[in-house]
Each structure stands twice: as structure tokens, then as C-alpha cells.
Regions:
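Glycine-rich anion-binding loops and their surrounding alpha/beta cores
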Residues: 1-157
Length: 157
């Protein structure tokens, strides 16, 4: 998102009575956490990997706002990795390879994003458990199976 929209997005989520919601200032305008934090947030600007939202706790919505530092979870990259070829085909192939268990930056990105999103939304009690569950979903083949089931269902005429 662009700065200034986070509160608007969160307000819309609350108006729709969602029990949890998150906005992420992701890399290159996406809603995905980068594998590097870069400069932390300050009073003037929000960092890449800044997450803000709310989650349920004790029957109430609890707000949160924080930078997500991948290094705190064991992901240490000097530069944010990029695929050699930037095409939809290369992204799809890399994603399928990662969901098949191929280790590397795309795999790390999937684990980090899935786990931290689940944790921040209150679906997992802590980041370490969330990371473990995300990794188990890929290593067991459950994540790839879900994607393949979705693709098959959407291709039916």
C-alpha cells in the first residue's frame, strides 16, 4: 500500500466486522514481507515489512503495529533475492518448486509470509509455532495439494 492508506484499509475491515485484519507495507508495492528489513520505521516513514492491524484476544480486538525483521526468524539475506527472469512463468515455476520443498529464497519467502501473517492475525500463538506449521504444510505436500485442488476446481467448465 502507499503510506496513508493503512488506516483506511483497516477501517474498512472493521466496518465489515472482520475479527482480524492486517495491512503490510511490502516489497515493491506488494503486501508481501521482504526477506530483508532495511531501515526500520521511524516517525517520518514506515519501513518495508511494516505490519499494522488487529486480532482477537479475550473477546476483543487487539491492535498491533510493528516492523517484521526476517533476521529475527533466521532469514539473513544481504540483498533481497530476485529471480533471474522476471516473468509470470518464472514466478509460477519458482512457487511450485518451493511448494514442492525446494529450498531457497522463494521457499523462505513463502514460509516467512505465511507464518507471520498467521501469527499476526491471531491464528497461531507465536511466531516460532507459526514457522513450524508453515514449514510442515510445505514439507508434507499439503500446501501444494491445496493449490493443485484449487487450480483443478477453477479449471472445470
Amino acid at each position: 500500500y502507499h503510506s496513508g492508506y493503512e488506516d483506511k484499509f483497516l477501517r474498512i475491515m472493521e466496518e465489515y466486522k472482520l475479527t482480524s485484519g492486517i495491512v503490510v507495507k511490502g516489497e515493491e508495492g506488494t503486501s508481501h514481507f521482504s526477506l530483508r528489513l532495511g531501515k526500520p520505521s521511524d516517525t517520518e516513514r514506515k519501513a518495508i515489512n511494516y505490519a499494522q492491524g488487529f486480532r482477537p484476544k479475550d473477546q476483543e480486538k487487539t491492535p498491533f503495529a510493528q516492523d517484521v525483521d526476517p533476521a529475527a526468524f533466521g532469514y539473513t539475506y544481504d540483498q533481497n533475492p530476485r529471480l533471474p527472469e522476471i516473468t509470470s512463468q518464472s514466478f509460477a515455476e519458482a512457487g511450485l518448486a518451493a511448494l514442492s520443498g525446494q529450498q531457497g529464497p522463494v521457499y523462505d519467502r513463502l514460509i516467512l509470509n505465511t507464518a507471520l501473517t498467521d501469527h499476526l492475525l491471531g491464528l497461531e500463538p507465536d511466531p516460532d509455532t507459526a514457522l513450524q506449521h508453515a514449514q510442515e504444510a510445505i514439507e508434507s505436500g499439503r500446501a501444494l495439494n491445496r493449490l493443485q485442488t484449487y487450480i483443478a476446481a477453477t479449471n472445470q467448465k
